[in-house]
Regions:
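N-terminal presequence-like segments and the immediate start of the first folded domain
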Residues: 1-61, 65-70, 75-78, 85-143
Length: 143
């Protein structure tokens, strides 16, 4: 069997019983693909039921933790997709304000859309990202 070239990341600080990895990392020079980050605490409970901003902020925090565990940072993000349970543009704008603020001074392209339902009961926000994978360490110069 060929050597596996993808690392699946499950950060210790996030809900550990999730049935999926929070991010995957390709070899150096590759990409990090996050799972959809959710507004779920380490206990597996949705944070801020009914509160779009609280859920967006928790989701972003979880996304950044997953990216960090994969060796990436907000400045490495190439694109995000933001899902919001709504049919209201006002709600989309509210969530977008939290996302834009969290990524400043970076401004990665994003898709923002309203959806009918997400995976957890009372979940209103989910965000996924694609980021640059960490570069390999430079070898020490020869003496």
């Amino acid at each position: 069997m060929p050597e596996r070239r993808i690392d699946f990341v499950k950060p210790a600080g996030l809900y550990r019983d999730a049935p999926y990895a929070y991010a995957s990392v390709a070899p150096a020079g590759g990409l990090v693909f996050s799972a959809g980050a959710c507004p779920v605490g380490p206990d597996g409970i949705v944070v801020g039921p009914g509160d779009l901003t609280a859920q967006a902020e928790t989701t972003i925090s979880n996304l950044f933790e997953a990216l960090e565990a994969a060796g990436a940072s907000p400045g490495d993000v190439l694109k995000t997709t933001v899902y919001v349970v709504t049919s209201s543009q006002k709600d989309l704008v509210e969530v977008w304000a939290a996302v834009k603020s969290a990524f400043e001074p970076f401004d990665p392209p994003s898709t923002l859309l309203g959806v009918a339902v997400l995976g957890y009961t009372e979940q209103l926000v989910e965000i996924e990202a694609v980021a640059l994978a960490p570069a390999p360490s430079e070898p020490a110069p020869s003496p």
